[in-house]
Each structure stands twice: as C-alpha cells, then as structure tokens.
Amino acid sequence: MASSILPPEGEALATGWEPDLAPADSLVRQAVLAHASWATDAARRAGKPWYDGDSWAGSVLGDSGPMTNWVIQKQPVDPAEVILDAARQLPNNVPYLFVSPWPTRDLREHGLALAGHPPLMVHLPTTEIVPPATDIDIRQVTDAAGLAEAERVLIEGYPLPELQPFRSGCMYDASFLEGSTVWVGYDGDVPLATSTAHSAAGVTIVENVAVMPAARGRGAGAAITWAATKHHDQPAVLIASDNGQPVYQRLGYLRLERWTVWVRP
C-alpha cells in the first residue's frame, strides 16, 4: 500500500526552493524572496555593491555597522558556502547581517557572532483590528528632508550606536524612496518615530521601525508600524525584535517560524 503514494519514477519533485519556482508557492518563500529584494534594492539604486543569485542575495551600503549591509540565504545550502561566496562577490572588509531562514551550524569559525533566532511574523490583509490610536502625527516621507529625519530617528531611536553621532546618508540614499515607502511620526515638528515598507514577491516587508524615548508609551510604535503594514493590500511580514513582538502581536501579526541571524562584526 505504501507504494501507492510514490510518484512515477523520474518525476521531478519540488522542494519549494528551486530558483524558477513561483514566489507564491508558499508564504515563507514569499518572505524569503522579499527579504532578498530588501537586502539589495537600496544598494542597487544607490550604485553600491550588490549581488542576487540563486542561493543568496546581499549588498554593501556602508562600512559603519551591520544593519547597513545584509546577506540573506535564499536556499537551504551550507551557509559556509554563502559566506565564502559573499567574500568574493562583495567587499570583504565590512560588517554585515547574515540572515538564514533555516537553522545553521556554528559559524563562529567564519568570523560571525550569533545574534539570535527571531521570529518571522505575518499579518494577513483579512485580519481585522481597530487601528491603533496615537497623539503622534504620522506622515509619509516625500522629500530629502523628511528622509533625513527618518534616518535620524532610526539611528538614535532604535538605537544604532555604531552609526552615531548621526550623519545623514549612512542608511538612506536619496534614491531609497524609489523602492520603498517611509513614514515619520511627529509631535509638532519634532520627529519621534519611523517605519518603512518594501513590496516584493507579493508581500510587504515592514522594516526599520524605531521610536524615540519621548514617544514611547504613546502608541507611536504601533501606529507607525500599522502605516507600513497597511500600505499595500497584501500580506505583510517582518523579522521581529524582542521589544517589537508584543506590539506586532497586538496588531494581529502571527509568528510563522524562527529564522537565524548572525553578525559579521
């Protein structure tokens, strides 16, 4: 009886990670491919080094901190092979985040340090909640001045000490808005919160969520995340930090699985 469920001999069986497989094969695949787009889009538009192949994608925007540079696996291959290939394809003297949608072996021998196993979370467009309330004014960024304010909030509010003191252009080139949408939350004219949405592979990546101390406890984090989440009528995904998870869960986000994040210092 067991043989009745076996496919015909020689039939090609999809694993879900073939390069030519449609993104919509699974929600996790969409999330992986969308993060690969996120990892390369800003650098590609800014004329900085980037690479997007079958098994991994990555780029180098700067040399001051790992959050500016991403390498993400697109297939369940040996991560050591990806690290070695990244050293050939990209500048090899900069810090970066190494993101794997799968568990990895110990990569310390390759100069990486384990950052953790954060959950990939998803928000489905059919999820109904009451939009979060805040006294912060949420505005979509449309110009260079607004982008610089978003960048400052991200660096000082997240915070990213390796990019301090703040220098405009470390994270966001002027071309960034051509591929992503950014919001800033203001109290009067003071920028206090920010988020970004990047659409690819049929999902929205919600990234770069940060809130300054003066806006915490005022619903700013939830409201600025909600703006990015609902920007496109499609599923939204994000890699959640420890501090962000409770906020995202209240917005209707669900945990899908844990990913693995290493840092090249």
Q: Model-flagged regions — what are they?
A:
Residues 162-210:
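A conserved beta-strand-loop-helix scaffold within acyl/acetyltransferase catalytic domains
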Residues 66-75, 202-213:
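Conserved acetyl-CoA binding element of GNAT-fold acetyltransferases
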Residues 43-53, 92-96, 101, 115-118, ...:
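A short helix-loop-beta-strand connector motif used in the catalytic cores of GNAT acetyltransferases and
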Residues 79-86, 208-231, 250:
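Conserved acetyl-CoA-binding loop-helix of GNAT-fold acetyltransferases
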Residues 74-142, 238-240, 244, 259-264:
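Acyl-donor-binding surface of acyltransferase catalytic domains
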Residues 107, 248, 253:
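Conserved active-site tyrosine of GNAT-family acetyltransferases
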Residues 144-156:
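A short, well-structured alpha-helix characteristic of acyl/acetyltransferase catalytic modules
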Residues 1-91:
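N-terminal charged segments
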